[in-house]
Design a protein with these regions (language model features):
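N-terminal polyanion-binding entry modules of DNA glycosylases/AP lyases
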Residues: 1-96, 103
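Alpha-helical ds-nucleic-acid-binding substructure associated with the helix-hairpin-helix region
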Residues: 72-145
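Phosphate-backbone recognition surface of nucleic-acid-processing proteins
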Residues: 139-147, 157-179
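PRPP/pyrophosphate-binding module of the type I phosphoribosyltransferase fold
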Residues: 153
Length: 179
């Protein structure tokens, strides 16, 4: 196994030095900040992560403003009330990524988020209160309650939100059968 210092040295050289490497490191948000983020933002980030799976992030990010408009700025109650006709129309919208299962997952996830909001007051409060030493359990909770958040999507979503988490390599996932 390669020593961490060797890996770190390679990374510093690759990105242009210590400062460049430091600027790329993830800085988790404190729990108080997570609790203050609106539920609409969590729903947006969750579904952006879902659409990024299997596609280039640049493609998804370029189209995301159209998603914000199409999904009413990801207002949880509004999206949860979308009917199948609304979603079928969106699945044909050329401004969006026309992936029917993922389009329908947005509504499913809004409904799941409503349940968490009803139980804990907000999705952010739920994330903020989750014990740091139970990270994998949080991944499993997200995978169970939400649609299209399997594999590395749950930890990637948490990382995008600023929740402290780690990411498993494909090697680890294949050998541990966690997901």
């Amino acid at each position: 196994m390669t020593e961490f210092s060797v890996v770190e040295k390679r990374a510093r050289e690759r990105v242009g030095g210590v400062d460049a490497l430091e600027s790329r490191l993830i800085r988790p948000e404190p729990p108080e900040s997570l609790a203050m983020i609106g539920d609409d933002r969590y729903l947006s980030v969750m579904n952006r992560r879902i659409f990024r799976a299997g596609l280039t992030h640049r493609l998804v990010d370029a189209r995301w403003p159209a998603f914000e408009i199409a999904f009413a700025d990801f207002n949880v109650d509004t999206v949860a009330a979308f009917d199948d006709t609304d979603l079928q129309r969106l699945a044909r919208d050329e401004a969006l990524i026309r992936h029917r299962k993922k389009i329908f997952a947005v509504r499913d996830n809004a409904i799941a988020m409503q349940a968490i909001i009803a139980e804990f007051g907000s999705f952010g409060v739920r994330l903020a209160d989750w014990a740091e030493d139970e990270t994998v359990e949080l991944w499993l909770e997200l995978r169970t309650r939400f649609t299209q958040l399997g594999g590395n999507s749950a930890p990637a979503f948490l990382r995008m939100c600023g929740k402290d988490t780690f990411l498993l390599t494909n090697w680890v996932v294949r050998r541990t059968h966690i997901f």
